[in-house]
């Protein structure tokens, strides 16, 4: 009857916590690390946001002596003030790996998933879609934000900041070519369009009227109202005459 965000975060954390402990026991020489002790968040606008500075410091301390194999439960974190269990959102395990890789200045970040990497389109819709071998950080971020669910979007920033390449490989097809995400691709002008992605079940709202023309702060009021209600905008289009603004 009582499912508060705090209770929910605690319940959903058990999957990663238990599975990582089990895998640790199966791998010789492996050591388990509790990510709640070094992945720290703070509450802003009713959301748990990573405290990057504190987290980086704690990660470096936790991994000052790295064992042969380190197992870390992804996705879960803890509030830096209360110590309560929090999480990094759906897909947060990728984000956990990126945070640790960036803090430790890793040579690369490998993400093993169930697809061969980024595709030129959704293969369930376009049968001729094929794997994109190279993407820049910006290109990958755009594809992720618009529906390509290969990598959790926040994953890219920590490693991009440190110029650490991300290698996407398929667990069920380890010999597949995969996708490498890095600062600069080998031939950036090879294709004007790298890939096509789409988002289902989204809303597009247009605010229009001649009374908007030349009026300062209209968009500010729109975005303020959305932010107040915890709504994030991923698409904005405005007419040059300023008489309409479309948001998605």
Residue ranges and their predicted role:
Residues 177-248:
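A conserved regulatory-domain signal marking ACT and ACT-like small-molecule sensing domains
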Residues 33, 72-74, 112, 153, ...:
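Generic beta-strand/beta-sheet core signal
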């Amino acid at each position: 009857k009582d499912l508060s965000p705090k209770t929910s975060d605690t319940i959903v954390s058990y999957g990663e916590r238990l599975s990582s402990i089990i895998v640790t026991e199966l791998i010789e020489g492996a050591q388990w690390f509790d990510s709640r002790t070094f992945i720290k968040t703070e509450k802003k606008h009713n959301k748990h946001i990573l405290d990057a500075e504190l987290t980086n410091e704690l990660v470096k301390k936790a991994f000052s002596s790295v064992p042969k194999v380190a197992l870390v439960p992804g996705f879960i974190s803890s509030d830096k003030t209360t110590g309560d269990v929090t999480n990094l959102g759906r897909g947060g395990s990728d984000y956990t790996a990126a945070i640790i890789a960036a803090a430790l200045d890793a040579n690369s970040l490998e993400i093993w998933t169930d697809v061969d990497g980024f595709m030129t389109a959704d293969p369930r819709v376009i049968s001729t879609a094929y794997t994109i071998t190279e993407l820049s950080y910006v290109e990958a971020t755009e594809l992720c934000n618009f529906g390509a669910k290969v990598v959790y979007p926040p994953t890219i920033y920590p490693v991009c900041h440190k110029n650490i390449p991300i290698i996407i490989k398929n667990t069920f097809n380890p010999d597949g070519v995969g996708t490498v995400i890095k600062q600069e691709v080998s031939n950036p002008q090879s294709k004007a369009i790298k890939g096509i992605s789409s988002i289902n079940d989204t809303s597009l709202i247009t605010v229009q009227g001649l009374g908007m023309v030349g009026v300062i702060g209209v968009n500010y009021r729109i975005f303020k109202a959305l932010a107040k209600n915890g709504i994030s905008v991923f698409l904005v289009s405005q007419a040059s005459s300023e008489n309409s603004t479309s948001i998605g």
